[in-house]
Amino acid sequence: MDRFLVISSDGHAGPHAADYRDYVDPAFRDAFDVALPIQIRMTEEAAKSFLVDDINREWRKGRESQLAGAWDAEARDKVLDADGVAAEVLFPDGVTEMNAPPFGAGFSMPPEGVTADLQWAGCLAHNRWMAEFVATAPERRIGLACIPVLWDIERSLEGIRWAHQNGLRGVIFPPRWGHFAGYHHTRYDPVWEICQDLDLPIHFHSGPAPIEEYFGPMPAPEGHEIQPGAMGIYITEVAQWLVRPLTFMLWGGVFERFPRLKVAITEGTAVWVPEYLALLEQRYSETHYSQKLGDYRSHLSMSPADYFRRNVRVGASCMPRREAQMRHEIGLGTIMWGTDYPHPEGSWPYTREQLLETFQGLPESEIGRMLGGNAAEFYNIDTEKLAPLVARIGPEKRLFVDPARSPA
């Protein structure tokens, strides 16, 4: 084929916040009605901290119908076609479109400030909506279920089974666990086992972090001033919080006990991977400096870095050329490119131009792996079903040939 298969590892979708009501269990709809205006107000406060409102409003002008693809399947397919994206992995949405799931659900699922029953109600509402949305084009939508696994293992197993039975193809877990046991604890073994057996990759998405430490209380009291450096601190540390669950799982022997378990780390850049792997290798190695620490390796048959290479993939959203040039250090088989539609920091509506900027001049086979091949393998996507679509919309390979650009 003379066109690339493109699979975005990072897309966001969800209905208008008020429209979640029909998907919430009836027992929780009164609570939903009370919580909705509070959620909207807090989302608006978050937008003031995380988005430059004037720039965001300007960016949205004239694009409203295309941004409706966050909840409208027909509009979304038009956007995907224009971008050359054949399939995508779908996370919940949030601040940008003011459509986060209710009750602290979504890809954050914080363990504080919400009750277990309410957070479960919000997650199940989103999962029901996502299952319907995926059904509009199951060959190109890889929907993910929100599972607030910290609260109740048995309930989590039920939610995971439901997700699998209803066409969802992965799960999202909270990256921060607060007062609950970390992911090295064996209490989660039944969860790892079912995700392995059903071949449902586990996802951690960038964003959650101790926001109040950077920006102060939210909603902010009148007259509150955000301190210098808050955003810089956040965008530096947020990747650390994203990777932290993985560190617990790697050292905890999760991938030793469950060798076919899959984990994706999404929208936290990929530039951190080489140094992270180097650190894991160093800490695993027998050295004079670690002798006094006792035996912390015998439960592992290989280094944590090797488990990473085998079991983990990185959703490299809005990937810059610098990361493409680091592809062998990161791991060519580790990278899964993503567009991050419909967020303003993503590649849309200039995805085709961004792809050329990032990948032009690199070997065709390597571009193919990063743009879609790795994701197709990770999610067991039937590429034959996508072939007619790719033949119509996929980026032409000839455009990526440029002898003047270094393939390094």
Where do the PLM segments sit?
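Divalent metal-dependent hydrolysis catalytic cores, especially in the metallo-beta-lactamase
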Residues: 6, 60-64, 81-104, 140-149, ...
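Short, well-ordered beta-to-alpha junction loops that form the rim of enzyme active sites
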Residues: 11, 85, 90-94, 146-148, ...
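Short catalytic/ligand-binding loop motif for oxyanion handling, primarily in non-cytosolic enzymes
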Residues: 14-17, 88-90, 96-102, 151-155, ...
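Surface-exposed, active-site-proximal loop segments in enzymatic domains
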Residues: 56-61, 99-115, 154
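Short, flexible, mixed-charge acidic loops at enzyme active sites
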Residues: 95-106, 215-225
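Short glycine/proline- and charge-enriched loop/turn segments
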Residues: 105-113, 221-234, 351-356
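Catalytic pocket-lining loop regions of alpha/beta-barrel enzymes
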Residues: 118-119, 134, 140-142, 158-336, ...
